[in-house]
Amino acid sequence: MRFFRGRKVELETLVFNFRKAIETAKDNDEPGEFFRKFPVGQCGNTSDILAQYLIDNEIGPITYVNGTYYGDDLEDRWAHTWLVVNGLVIDITGDQFKYHKRPLAYDIPVYIGPMTEFYRLFEVSPGGRCEHYGLEKQWIHYHELKDWYEVILKYLR
């Protein structure tokens, strides 16, 4: 796998096209909870599938990051997942927070850039950050993720 360095334009093209393919699949009523709910509650699945796509396009290494936002109220707790490539945050589901109140309100559908205050809101435990090597067959949801990935690829061709 080649290391991403100075190819932000290529990375942006891949990522924006991937998000567009998911939106098109959703608009075409592709089956599955992933497409029905996207982007709400799909940041983990999306990050896994996007990581596989980037790996397939020889972009890496990729870090998977999962954090939790803790509000003042005990019930005010939200998880979010994104990827990091060469120090750049890659998030194509941030707009799932567009109806939340500040400080969690966020309406950017595709973000590629440095860490921002929004991402700093999420507490990342040591186990919440790991290298991503693509979809792995031993994962409990592997077949679902793989099926969704194949549908998305259909819209990228």
Label for each model-derived stretch:
Residues 1-157:
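A structural boundary/capping signal
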